[in-house]
From Swiss-Prot:
Catalyzes the formation of the alpha-1,6-glucosidic linkages in glycogen by scission of a 1,4-alpha-linked oligosaccharide from growing alpha-1,4-glucan chains and the subsequent attachment of the oligosaccharide to the alpha-1,6 position. Residues 654-705 are annotated as: Disordered. This is 1,4-alpha-glucan branching enzyme GlgB. It catalyses: Transfers a segment of a (1->4)-alpha-D-glucan chain to a primary hydroxy group in a similar glucan chain. It comes from Deinococcus radiodurans (strain ATCC 13939 / DSM 20539 / JCM 16871 / CCUG 27074 / LMG 4051 / NBRC 15346 / NCIMB 9279 / VKM B-1422 / R1). The lineage of its organism: Bacteria, Thermotogati, Deinococcota, Deinococci, Deinococcales.
């Protein structure tokens, strides 16, 4: 429960100078008592407005009953005794040009169910029981050496009621919690939570940055969801969109009749791809609005982290546009956005210890997960390069894969440059891209076998994991945000096999330190064989960076049975099977290994060798029976000259791309020298900036429309 601060000069000045990180404690609608009278204090930022009043159920939407008083620095406020929790309201704003528009509260914590959009006065009251979880989260911190397996879930379409309406957050809590616990995920990442008017935006065109969508219930219902998942040991992450906002007249757009939350110049402030506006990161009140939103979720709603959407669109002034305005150095980086992101991550980590800040950043921008001040300060970054290379490889007919063998080895060249999440997200199963299992070539059996191999390689490759809902039971259709998942698939043997595999992968990932402690370390993975291009076979070891315990991964990525295949190993003795994607439990044939004794023969630079039978399109994971620390594993440098040349050319291509403008070292210098936001422009209280503004982001449209 929060209490409003006095609307005095000192507190308003702190907001203007970016010293008040929770502006929602000052602005918005706050039930309170003044001079012994109960009512609601309303406050809003509209520096260029001619007149502002609050209208709602308490005054029959009459704009003359409760005018707001103009305060210092462009703020307006009033105490309304007639107002009470549960009533609807809006701000009636007469802008600089004389036009009057009813606006929803930017700091509103609850809204009507779409298509209606009025804000609702809300007295939040919830008894949390997750203090132990929050203490553990703070101790865990960045969790670089912990297993993190994320189940990405769209709250509006994971499941529905029998009548087709959305589940309540409380119902979702129990059903989702039971499923995620059974499958062994450590976290859920929820999209579509923050209030948005258009279902087809998937929640990526936000109008309520401080409010969970009312489609699924009240703020207390959402708190119940988070609290219940914490009781099951499941972390909760949210998708958060500080890169752009919709042009709907009732919300943030031209809030006081002029560009306010958005850049005034359309070359900086308008996303042509998505028909959305870009936040003005140079304006303190806007920066604090966004940082306050982030803190609302990680503090008040106990959320464990935010996946920041479309970071690339924020970083580059020329992102998806031909006309753009250079920064003060003549470059294409948005220095104000860089400063904002650094301040955001610093404040979030300080105010909510242990919360994870994850960037969806699709370029080679340096230092995304480097701590501030040298870097942006995120904890993790999505591995978009790994995703693109892996899908491009697995979508090919196996007969041609030998020509792109490097696509599955290249990630290891740069995997320690950032802290990565290997993400197969909602973006990969929409817009005719096909569901994951159907991306693979061949008949239905071949597709499932190949998909199982992909999943096993994903879970044994260094990096945290994220898988979108439905893909863990091989959903046979693209995601439809207007319909629940086809859960009947989960009861069919073909789909159940993939589901069993993901469950087993999560189990091994959580239990085996060699599968997660070295995610961000060079020694966490070593190639045994990275150059068998003709057979499309890969072999690598995962190693616990503390005990030295290790496991061996062998992937046969063609539909060819390979008998007596030789793999070098550093340790003699007996081995056992930890996992085979060809097991009958997973939908395979159940190929057996007749002999798992290492022979004293040299292979792949190792002193011993195993002779294995490799099932078609499969991954086999082994461990030595007599576990012993092993340090002499062949590293990724152990590539053939041909593969080294391919890797060199690929790396060179990345450098050429980085050199576009400016060079990477210049970019790194700019990042390091750009301080976290310390107070940029504050909005003038009497004069509006001219021009329009409209930005561009990553790719929203149907995706995030």
């Amino acid at each position: 429960m929060t209490f409003p601060l006095p609307l005095d000069h000192e507190h308003l000045q702190k907001l203007v100078t970016a010293d008040l990180v929770r502006p929602d404690h000052l602005l918005g609608a706050h039930p309170t008592t003044e001079h012994g009278v109960q009512g609601v204090r309303f406050a809003v930022w509209a520096p260029n407005a001619q007149h502002v009043s609050v209208v709602g159920d308490f005054n029959d939407w009459n704009g003359f009953d409760h005018p707001l008083q103009r305060l210092d620095f462009g703020f307006w406020g009033a105490f309304v005794p007639a107002a009470q929790p549960g009533q609807r309201y809006k701000f009636r704003v007469t802008g600089a040009g004389g036009q009057t528009v009813d606006k929803t509260d930017p700091y509103g914590t609850f809204f009507e169910v779409r298509p209606n959009n009025a804000s609702i006065i809300w007295q939040q009251d919830f008894e949390w029981t997750d203090a132990g979880w929050l203490e553990q989260r703070a101790r865990r911190g960045q969790a670089l050496e912990d297993p993190i397996s994320i189940y990405e879930c769209h709250v509006g379409s994971w499941a529905r009621r029998d009548d087709g309406w959305f589940l309540n957050y409380r119902d979702l809590a129990h059903r989702l919690g039971e499923y995620v616990t059974y499958m062994g995920y450590t976290h859920v990442e929820l999209l579509g939570v923050m209030e948005h008017p258009f279902d087809g935006s998937w929640g990526y065109q936000v109008t309520g940055y401080y409010a969970p969508t009312s489609r699924l219930g009240s703020p207390e219902d959402f708190k119940y969801l988070v609290n219940h998942l914490h009781s099951l040991g499941i972390g909760v992450l949210l998708d958060w969109v500080p890169g752009h906002f919709p042009t709907d007249e009732f919300a943030l757009a031209h809030f006081d009749g002029s560009p306010l939350y958005e850049y005034a110049d359309p070359r900086k402030g308008y996303h042509y791809d998505w028909n959305t506006y870009i936040f003005d990161y140079g304006r303190n009140e806007v920066v604090m609005f966004l940082i306050g939103s982030a803190l609302k979720w990680v503090q008040d709603y106990h959320v464990d982290g935010l996946r920041v959407d479309a970071v690339a669109s924020m970083l580059y002034l020329d992102f998806s546009r031909t006309e753009w305005v250079p920064n003060i150095y003549g470059g294409r980086e948005n220095l104000e956005a860089i400063a904002f992101l650094k301040r955001l991550n610093e404040v979030a980590h300080h105010m909510a210890p242990g919360c994870l800040m994850i960037a969806e950043e699709s370029t080679s921008f340096p230092g995304v997960t480097t701590p501030t001040p040298e870097g942006l300060g995120f904890d993790y970054k999505w591995a978009m390069g790994w995703m693109n290379d892996s899908l491009a490889y697995f979508e090919q007919d196996p007969i041609y894969r030998k020509y792109d063998h490097h696509k599955l080895t290249f990630f290891n060249v740069y995997r320690t440059s950032e802290n990565y999440v290997l993400a197969i997200s909602h973006d990969e199963v929409v817009h005719l891209k096909k569901p994951m299992v159907l991306k693979h070539p061949g008949d239905w059996y071949a597709q499932r076998a190949d998909y199982r191999a992909f999943l096993a390689m994903m879970w044994t490759t260094p990096g945290k994991k994220l898988l979108f809902m439905g893909q863990d039971f091989a959903q046979g259709s693209e995601w439809n945000h207007d319909a629940p998942l086809p859960w009947f698939h989960a009861d069919q043997p073909d789909h159940r096999g993939v589901m069993n595999l993901v469950r087993r992968l999560n189990e091994l990932y959580r239990e085996r330190p060699d599968w997660h402690t070295g995610d961000a370390r060079e020694e966490g993975m070593a190639w045994i064989s990275a150059d068998d291009t003709d057979n499309s076979v890969y072999a690598y070891a995962r190693r616990d960076t503390y005990s030295g315990a290790w496991s061996l991964v062998i992937a046969n990525l063609t539909p060819v049975y390979r008998e007596d295949y030789v793999i070098g190993v550093p340790q003699g003795g007996e081995y056992r099977v930890l996992l085979s994607t060809d097991d009958g439990e997973f939908g395979g044939f159940g190929t057996q290994q007749p002999d798992l004794s290492a022979r004293d023969e040299a292979a792949h630079g190792q002193a011993h060798a195993l002779h294995l039978n490799l099932p078609p399109s499969s991954v086999l994971v082994l461990e030595p029976v007599a576990a012993a620390p092993v340090k002499g594993l062949v590293s990724r440098q152990e590539l053939t000259p041909e593969l080294r040349e391919v890797a060199r050319q690929s790396a060179q291509a990345v450098q050429v791309e980085r050199a576009a403008d400016p060079r990477p070292n210049e970019q790194q210098r700019l990042v390091a020298e750009t301080p976290a936001h310390e107070g940029g422009r504050s909005a003038p209280a009497d004069a509006a900036e001219s021009a329009e503004q409209k930005p561009d982001d990553e790719q929203k449209g149907g995706k995030k429309a």
